[in-house]
């Protein structure tokens, strides 16, 4: 929600669903998180300034006809925090989490106030008000198992009909057992929504984006891209891992556990049914579900005759990646070689030096992973069709890998060929 206009629009969506007893999870407004981090930088330099955050929310409240006085205590709390940062000249992870939490806390108060003004009773909740507790891994906290029983207990009066106000809940933030505010890392707001929906055994969880659900490919690349009506959790996780803007993979874990479907809808096109994420396809499994791609990876080829018949060689190789904290994306192996991809942003110097002590190693940056999400039982047909299409486009995959899940085939191409590869594959499978 970038501004007052978007608050009005989101409020209209909430009002359209009020008979279904929704629980609403919100992120911070617009650029609030950036404003907060800028304010922290200024405080570290000795300047306490909340004007960026205050102006956005004060102006939005005025435009929405909301009294700003209930927001003043939070503004004072923020100012006190920044004053403390300016005095000690330090921003710890714990303090950073406390700082960025103001974005979500202000957002839910704004929405609840506006809905109530518009005769739709609503009540804001900070996540910890619903018993959403985490460990103390600041900036990337994990929720504790007790949230599964806490949430239904705290929302029981609303679920039973005794309480009428629509709950408006902060996404992304939590508290640890000591009462310190934590943030849930990437996909944190989606995770808040899915854990609430799953714990409450909701009919479905809806996540509202700016596209018509999950698309067969990036519509900015493929004008013929269309909405995929239904995907499985497994397919959606693979799509998210390889660049598609769906739910973050970790946010799908609660709904997979509870069996609650997730619908991805477009806040700019509310009439579109979007896409639904389910445990199993309700009908025939499509041969190809979607194509996605991610740029900026490095392809590493590791070759050694010592691999042939040697027990533990791969374990030694992978231990080097663990030692240097480098995550592997895609992998393919043969009797004497391993090819794999890693994020180019990772510092590879120490890793490559260690690997070269036991094998011949070639690192090739500037690569892209193009992934086809498909039906495992038709992988031969999918692969042959795809390779013919790429050959016609004069694109030669430098590595091919099929995931253990059997729902994706990944091909490595040059960064410069990524867009053409996606277009060629989309034309072959969907057009």
For each predicted feature, which ranges?
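Surface-exposed amphipathic alpha-helical tracts and adjacent flexible/coil segments at the periphery
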Residues: 247-249, 258, 268-275, 348
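Structural motif
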Residues: 21-24, 121-123, 164-168, 172, ...
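Glycine-rich beta-alpha junction loops
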Residues: 29-30, 129, 211-213, 260-262, ...
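Nucleotide/pyrophosphate-binding catalytic subdomain
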Residues: 1-247, 252, 412-414
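A conserved regulatory-domain signal marking ACT and ACT-like small-molecule sensing domains
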Residues: 271-431
């Amino acid at each position: 929600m970038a501004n007052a206009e978007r608050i009005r629009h989101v409020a209209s969506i909430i009002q359209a669903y009020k008979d279904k007893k929704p629980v609403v999870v919100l992120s911070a407004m617009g650029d609030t998180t950036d404003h907060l981090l800028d304010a922290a930088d200024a405080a570290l330099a000795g300047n306490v300034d909340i004007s960026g955050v205050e102006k956005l929310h004060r102006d939005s409240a005025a435009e929405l006809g909301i009294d700003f006085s209930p927001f003043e205590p939070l503004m004072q709390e923020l100012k006190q925090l920044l004053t403390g940062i300016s005095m000690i000249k330090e921003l710890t992870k714990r303090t950073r989490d406390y700082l960025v939490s103001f974005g979500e806390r202000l957002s839910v108060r704004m929405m609840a106030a506006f809905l109530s003004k518009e005769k739709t009773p609503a009540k804001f909740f900070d996540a910890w008000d619903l018993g959403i507790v985490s460990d103390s891994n600041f900036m990337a906290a994990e929720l504790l198992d007790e949230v599964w029983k806490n949430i239904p207990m705290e929302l029981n009066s609303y679920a039973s009909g005794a309480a009428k106000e629509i709950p408006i809940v902060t996404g992304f933030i939590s508290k640890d057992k000591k009462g310190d505010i934590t943030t849930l890392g990437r996909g944190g707001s989606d995770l808040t929504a899915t854990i609430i929906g799953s714990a409450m055994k909701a009919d479905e969880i809806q996540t509202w984006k700016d596209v018509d659900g999950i698309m067969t490919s990036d519509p900015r690349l493929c004008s013929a891209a269309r909405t995929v009506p239904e995907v499985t959790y497994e397919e959606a996780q693979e799509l998210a891992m390889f660049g598609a803007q769906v739910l973050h993979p970790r946010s799908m874990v609660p709904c997979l556990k509870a069996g609650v479907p997730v619908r991805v809808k477009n806040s700019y096109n509310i009439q579109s049914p979007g896409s639904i994420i389910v445990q199993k396809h309700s009908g025939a499994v499509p041969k190809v579900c979607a194509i996605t791609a991610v740029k900026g990876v490095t392809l590493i080829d590791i070759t050694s005759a010592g691999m042939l018949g040697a027990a533990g060689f791969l374990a030694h190789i992978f231990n080097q990646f663990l030692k240097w904290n480098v995550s592997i994306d895609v992998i393919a192996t043969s009797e004497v070689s391993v090819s794999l991809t890693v994020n180019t942003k990772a510092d590879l110097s120490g890793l490559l030096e260690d690997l070269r002590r036991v094998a011949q190693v070639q690192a090739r940056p500037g690569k892209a992973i193009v992934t086809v999400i498909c039906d495992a039982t038709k992988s031969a047909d999918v692969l042959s069709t795809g390779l013919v299409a790429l050959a016609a486009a004069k694109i030669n995959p430098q590595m091919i890998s099929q995931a253990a899940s059997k729902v994706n085939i990944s091909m490595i191409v040059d960064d410069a060929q990524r867009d053409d590869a996606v277009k060629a594959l989309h034309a072959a499978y969907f057009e």
